[in-house]
């Protein structure tokens, strides 16, 4: 399959974003998949245009976006995105939407149509912390996952799409001993395992839910 894997530019006054750093280190061929890579701006207003152009100019079977989730200790495939932008901080264009719908004609939520449980289990099988997430937040990461679901719903019915959040890397938490992190090498290993798990097979039926 032909997969577009995206990562984000740094934001919130940081100099690095592990999502893009990891994406750049992915192999161009992973299993049976051919990988293209795209760096997205951390910008509510710009990401839609970049994704639209990428899909218009290439035939991608799958778009998989990678984002930073500082404070998480595991690599977390996302199950669902919700139709709301509610930014705790401004994006890189100093734009801070509050309680705004992403697409007025969109569904309340869109679920990833990738095998998110198989992907999560594949990460865990590498001996790495992995967990299935049921919230992509309400910042640009959720926005991108929702926009991909919207595009699949309205324009690209065969498109498969998903999102994975990754932790900070150690360089980002200097002086913050209580903040979890993961080496870039392990993030790349985990993402590679998740991508290898993508197939046309049905997702695993295993208990990866949460009680809260």
Curated annotation (Swiss-Prot):
A GO molecular function held by the record: pyroglutamyl-peptidase activity
GO cellular component, one term: cytosol
Location in or out of the cell: Cytoplasm
Reaction catalyzed: Release of an N-terminal pyroglutamyl group from a polypeptide, the second amino acid generally not being Pro
Gene Ontology process terms (BP): proteolysis
Active site: 78, 141, 165
EC numbers, comma separated: 3.4.19.3
Cross-referenced PROSITE patterns: PYRASE_CYS (PS01334), PYRASE_GLU (PS01333)
Keyword Cytoplasm carried by entry: yes
Top EC class of this enzyme: hydrolase
UniProt cross-references to Gene3D superfamilies, sorted A to Z: Peptidase C15, pyroglutamyl peptidase I-like
UniProtKB keywords: Cytoplasm, Hydrolase, Protease, Thiol protease
Zinc among keywords: no
Listed InterPro entries: Peptidase_C15, Peptidase_C15-like, Peptidase_C15-like_sf, PGP-I_bact-type, PGPEP1_Cys_AS, PGPEP1_Glu_AS
Free-text function comment from the UniProt entry: Removes 5-oxoproline from various penultimate amino acid residues except L-proline.
NCBIfam families from the UniProt entry: PRK13197.1 (NF009676), pyro_pdase (TIGR00504)
Family of the protein in this entry: Belongs to the peptidase C15 family.
Subunit structure: Homotetramer.
Protein's recorded name: Pyrrolidone-carboxylate peptidase
Source organism of the structure: Staphylococcus aureus (strain bovine RF122 / ET3-1)
Species lineage: Bacteria, Bacillati, Bacillota, Bacilli, Bacillales
